[in-house]
């Protein structure tokens, strides 16, 4: 006599129990259809897992399963239990899987309705059975017009390990990680994205006891699991990633709080754009809502520096050979030609500095008119920093001190340029620091702005200072990446900022020299360069008489305005 296996007993028991259940009138049971493609000798193999483990014998007759999904009004097409495409196995060999995972629920592998399988559940025109429990591993079926993502959600939930929020899509897009330990960041604290633990640790360290000593070699790994193992290395990494006591706390608070704040800012900015007689001329930028809420571009220092570096203008070539010996007219013609070309690119560069184009057109013009020679001189120093004793005006024009002495009155300016360049060389100026200093010169050149205390003027100035603070934070962050101690970073920041005053002094010297050359008719000036020079002289004369700066554009500003308006 054939002895029935335990699996057969269980199958028969389940089959008889289900077929003996009472069905309300008009209902029909679901049937598991025979599988021909995977049957081997009365056994069924998994379409996914092709292993050497013994297959399970299954009775040949259909097994009836009571359906809780009756009379839903949907035409449920065939739903295969397993789908290689859904699991992401691709075209990998089926033999790679060594065993069948019996714990997996079949509902995890339901694909969209467009796929057809020989193993299917057929639903007839029936109605929902009242008060019938929907137990087991069966999940709620959805209408056939839903997208494929609806059926992938259970699998995604098992794989993804992210926090659930009310606005999950926006929350995942805004997800940041702690720059110190790589845990989930709770906000932007002390100048970087950081978690609550590292924020609190840094706060305690800068407010009190911080003379930590590393028991090893000051190279301990600081991550989510080992951040508490060494306080000295943790504090060192806080400084390395850019955490600072004086850092502007952008995006402060949780993600939900920042979302509410951004909505308030959007409403405020909308009112600014649509109100006032000058709404067409002045574009709104984020500005302070109150004394404690500082609003800015919401860019991290690293992102801001990346944007400014991408805005750097291309190299300018003179495109002609200068015959030696150099003459005063020859040198001045070449230098003014290069300066005029650089001015066009400088205006394009300024408009790519984050937040600059959001200032009023009046402020943009005045800032450029006040700083243009400082920006050109800083660029000259940066190109010359690796060439001691020479000034690299362009890749095809470099002058030594002796070659520049042919221009009357130029030796003093030449020596000052070489001295400032030598100082940058001693400091080993980095490119990130250079672009920050360049942007600071642009935004800090407000000597020609009106000194009136009107509400509109104060608002414009606050917008400008907000941008300047952001660039200053970026410079502090760039210095922190050099690996210096806190005291050394503070000293380096002071040295770099002090050089800006020397560059302004150099700019005034150069402007006076260029004006003298113009008055002596030693060299013709090009349109844009001439407009910039006249504007600087006009602003200097107005400041000497303590007169207010008019808000209307004059004829001197026409060239600058035309270049700015072309790209606005």
UniProtKB/Swiss-Prot annotation:
<dbReference type="GO" id="GO:0005634">
    <property type="term" value="C:nucleus"/>
</dbReference>
<keyword id="KW-0675">Receptor</keyword>
<keyword id="KW-0446">Lipid-binding</keyword>
<keyword id="KW-0238">DNA-binding</keyword>
<feature type="DNA-binding region" description="Nuclear receptor">
    <location>
        <begin position="178"/>
        <end position="243"/>
    </location>
</feature>
<dbReference type="InterPro" id="IPR021064">
    <property type="entry name" value="ER-beta-like_N"/>
</dbReference>
<comment type="subunit">
    <text>Binds DNA as a homodimer. Can form a heterodimer with ER-alpha.</text>
</comment>
<dbReference type="Pfam" id="PF12497">
    <property type="entry name" value="ERbeta_N"/>
</dbReference>
<dbReference type="InterPro" id="IPR028355">
    <property type="entry name" value="ER-beta/gamma"/>
</dbReference>
<comment type="function">
    <text>Binds estrogens with an affinity similar to that of ER-alpha, and activates expression of reporter genes containing estrogen response elements (ERE) in an estrogen-dependent manner.</text>
</comment>
<dbReference type="Pfam" id="PF00104">
    <property type="entry name" value="Hormone_recep"/>
</dbReference>
<dbReference type="GO" id="GO:0030284">
    <property type="term" value="F:nuclear estrogen receptor activity"/>
</dbReference>
<dbReference type="InterPro" id="IPR001723">
    <property type="entry name" value="Nuclear_hrmn_rcpt"/>
</dbReference>
<feature type="zinc finger region" description="NR C4-type">
    <location>
        <begin position="214"/>
        <end position="238"/>
    </location>
</feature>
<keyword id="KW-0863">Zinc-finger</keyword>
<keyword id="KW-0805">Transcription regulation</keyword>
<feature type="domain" description="NR LBD">
    <location>
        <begin position="300"/>
        <end position="536"/>
    </location>
</feature>
<keyword id="KW-0479">Metal-binding</keyword>
<keyword id="KW-0539">Nucleus</keyword>
<dbReference type="InterPro" id="IPR013088">
    <property type="entry name" value="Znf_NHR/GATA"/>
</dbReference>
<dbReference type="GO" id="GO:0005496">
    <property type="term" value="F:steroid binding"/>
</dbReference>
<dbReference type="GO" id="GO:0030520">
    <property type="term" value="P:estrogen receptor signaling pathway"/>
</dbReference>
<dbReference type="InterPro" id="IPR024178">
    <property type="entry name" value="Est_rcpt/est-rel_rcp"/>
</dbReference>
<dbReference type="GO" id="GO:0008270">
    <property type="term" value="F:zinc ion binding"/>
</dbReference>
<keyword id="KW-0804">Transcription</keyword>
<dbReference type="Pfam" id="PF00105">
    <property type="entry name" value="zf-C4"/>
</dbReference>
<dbReference type="GO" id="GO:0032355">
    <property type="term" value="P:response to estradiol"/>
</dbReference>
<keyword id="KW-0754">Steroid-binding</keyword>
<dbReference type="GO" id="GO:1990239">
    <property type="term" value="F:steroid hormone binding"/>
</dbReference>
<comment type="similarity">
    <text>Belongs to the nuclear hormone receptor family. NR3 subfamily.</text>
</comment>
<dbReference type="GO" id="GO:0071392">
    <property type="term" value="P:cellular response to estradiol stimulus"/>
</dbReference>
<dbReference type="InterPro" id="IPR000536">
    <property type="entry name" value="Nucl_hrmn_rcpt_lig-bd"/>
</dbReference>
<feature type="zinc finger region" description="NR C4-type">
    <location>
        <begin position="178"/>
        <end position="198"/>
    </location>
</feature>
<dbReference type="InterPro" id="IPR035500">
    <property type="entry name" value="NHR-like_dom_sf"/>
</dbReference>
<keyword id="KW-0862">Zinc</keyword>
<protein>
    <recommendedName>
        <fullName>Estrogen receptor beta</fullName>
    </recommendedName>
</protein>
<dbReference type="InterPro" id="IPR001628">
    <property type="entry name" value="Znf_hrmn_rcpt"/>
</dbReference>
<dbReference type="GO" id="GO:0043565">
    <property type="term" value="F:sequence-specific DNA binding"/>
</dbReference>
<feature type="region of interest" description="Modulating">
    <location>
        <begin position="1"/>
        <end position="177"/>
    </location>
</feature>
<dbReference type="InterPro" id="IPR050200">
    <property type="entry name" value="Nuclear_hormone_rcpt_NR3"/>
</dbReference>
């Amino acid at each position: 006599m054939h002895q029935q296996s335990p699996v057969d007993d269980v199958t028969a028991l389940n089959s008889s129990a289900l077929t003996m259940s009472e069905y309300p009138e008009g209902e029909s049971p679901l049937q598991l259809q025979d599988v021909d493609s995977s049957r081997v000798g009365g056994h069924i193999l998994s379409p996914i897992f092709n292993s050497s483990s013994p297959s399970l014998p299954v009775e040949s007759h259909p097994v009836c399963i009571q359906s809780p999904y009756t009379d839903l009004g949907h035409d449920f097409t065939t739903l295969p239990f397993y789908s290689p495409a859904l699991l992401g196995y691709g075209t990998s060999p089926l033999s790679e899987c060594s065993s069948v995972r019996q714990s997996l629920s079949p509902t995890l592998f339901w694909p969209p309705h467009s796929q057809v399988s020989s193993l299917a559940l057929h639903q007839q025109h029936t109605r929902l059975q009242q008060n019938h429990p929907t137990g087991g591993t069966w999940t709620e079926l959805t209408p056939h017009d839903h997208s494929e993502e609806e059926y992938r959600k259970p699998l995604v939930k098992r794989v993804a390990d992210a926090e659930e929020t009310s606005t999950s899509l926006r929350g995942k897009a805004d997800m940041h990680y702690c720059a110190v330990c790589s845990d989930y960041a709770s906000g932007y604290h002390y100048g970087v994205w950081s978690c609550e633990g590292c924020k609190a640790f840094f706060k305690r360290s800068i407010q009190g006891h911080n003379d930590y000593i590393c028991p090893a070699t000051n190279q301990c790994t600081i991550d989510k699991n080992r951040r508490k193992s060494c306080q000295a290395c943790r504090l060192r990494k806080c400084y390395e990633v850019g955490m600072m006591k004086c850092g502007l706390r952008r995006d402060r608070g949780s993600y939900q709080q920042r979302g509410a704040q951004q909505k308030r800012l959007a409403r405020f900015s909308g009112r600014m754009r649509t109100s006032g007689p000058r709404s067409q001329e002045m574009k709104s930028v984020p500005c302070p809502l109150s004394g404690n809420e500082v609003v800015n571009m919401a860019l991290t220092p690293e992102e801001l520096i990346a944007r400014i570096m991408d805005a750097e203008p291309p190299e300018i070539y003179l495109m002609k050979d200068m015959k030696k010996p150099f003459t005063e007219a020859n040198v001045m013609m070449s230098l003014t030609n290069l300066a005029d070309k650089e001015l066009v690119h400088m205006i394009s560069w300024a408009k790519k500095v984050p937040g600059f184009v959001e200032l009023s057109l009046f402020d943009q013009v005045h800032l450029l008119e006040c700083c243009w020679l400082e920006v050109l001189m800083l660029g000259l120093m940066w190109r010359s920093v690796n060439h001691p004793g020479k000034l690299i005006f362009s890749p095809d024009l470099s002058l030594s001190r002796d070659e520049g002495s042919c221009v009357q009155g130029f030796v003093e300016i030449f020596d000052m340029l070489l001295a400032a360049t030598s100082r940058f060389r001693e400091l080993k100026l980095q490119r990130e620091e250079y672009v920050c200093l360049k942007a600071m010169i642009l935004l800090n050149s407000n000597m020609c702005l009106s000194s009136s205390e009107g509400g509109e003027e104060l608002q414009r100035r606050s917008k400008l200072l907000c941008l300047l603070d952001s660039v200053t934070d970026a410079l502090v962050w760039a210095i922190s990446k050099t690996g210096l101690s806190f005291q050394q970073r503070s000293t380096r920041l002071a040295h770099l900022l002090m050089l800006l005053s020397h560059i302004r002094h150099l700019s005034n010297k150069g402007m006076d020299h260029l004006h003298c050359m113009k008055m002596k008719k030693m060299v013709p000036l090009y349109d844009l360069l001439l407009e910039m020079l006249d504007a600087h002289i006009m602003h200097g004369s107005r400041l000497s008489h303590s007169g207010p700066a008019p808000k209307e554009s004059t004829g001197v500003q026409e060239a600058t305005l035309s270049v700015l308006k072309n790209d606005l």
